[in-house]
């Protein structure tokens, strides 16, 4: 589960921007809030809104770029041909309309949860080169906090459950340490837990592609259909039911029923 994402100096984003899924301490809609095993509350849905050209899509693109920065080296070393399409390189570009920020690094900070722990991952990148990287963990069962690793330009420090792991003296300065650990220690339980979230815990859908958006509605789940109908009705549209059909040519048709 995504808890919080912060980015600074990325494309149209100059100052620090945070996308937060933590629920505010209010009594309204308590039945819709997700409650963690440790009592922390999270929103089931959130939205980024603003004028056209305001940089909304760049917030999500920043998150996508961070995820791909970590996963791409793992995909490159995989023998699975089916994931080749997922190896697209996303360039991490700084805010270009300022003579200072264009030469400054891009900063990412990510909080996310798995079934076992909450993690904080920080990555600072300048022209694809890793300037700083850090990973911390909080066990959900015990609440125990621990640092797992920290990396800067001068040294790499493996801590806690990672203390006995080894790194190469020739580790590339463009390769995230998290990616390196995923390649070298793929059977380590904590490494698998972290990278499992990056690989399967978050998906990116391009709503600029109407065909991809329609495919979301193809789901055979009645629960998904009811949720979509509820969202449509909350927008004051007169659609009370819909049916989606996909023909042999992979084309999609949507039939709607109105009041």
Please describe what each predicted stretch is.
Residues 41, 47, 61-120, 126-127:
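Conserved P-loop NTP-binding catalytic core
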Residues 21-23, 180, 256:
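Pocket-edge structural micro-motifs
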Residues 15, 97-99, 132, 180:
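Generic structural "secondary-structure junction" signal
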């Amino acid at each position: 589960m995504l808890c919080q994402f912060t980015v600074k100096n990325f494309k149209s984003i100059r100052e620090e921007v945070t996308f937060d899924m933590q629920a505010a301490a209010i009594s309204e809609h308590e039945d819709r809030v997700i409650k963690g095993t440790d009592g922390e509350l999270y929103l089931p849905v959130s939205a980024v809104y603003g004028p056209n050209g305001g940089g909304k899509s760049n917030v999500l693109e920043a998150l996508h770029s961070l995820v791909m920065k970590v996963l791409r080296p793992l995909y490159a070393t995989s023998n699975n041909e089916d994931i080749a399409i997922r190896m697209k390189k996303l360039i991490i570009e700084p805010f270009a309309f300022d003579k200072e920020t264009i030469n400054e690094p891009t900063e990412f900070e990510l909080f996310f949860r798995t079934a076992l722990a909450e993690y904080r991952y920080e990555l600072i990148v300048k022209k694809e080169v890793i300037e700083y990287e850090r990973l911390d963990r909080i066990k959900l069962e015990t609440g125990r906090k621990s640092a797992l690793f920290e990396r800067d330009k001068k040294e790499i420090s493996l801590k806690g459950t990672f203390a006995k792991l080894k790194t190469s003296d020739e580790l590339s300065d463009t390769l995230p340490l998290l990616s390196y650990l995923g390649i070298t220690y793929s059977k380590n339980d904590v490494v698998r837990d972290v990278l499992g979230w990056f690989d399967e815990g978050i998906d990116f859908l391009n709503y600029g592609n109407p065909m991809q958006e329609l495919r979301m509605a193809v789901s055979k789940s009645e629960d998904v259909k009811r949720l979509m109908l509820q969202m449509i009705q909350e927008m004051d549209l007169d659609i009370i039911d819909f049916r989606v059909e996909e023909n042999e040519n992979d084309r999609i048709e949507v039939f709607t029923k109105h009041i």
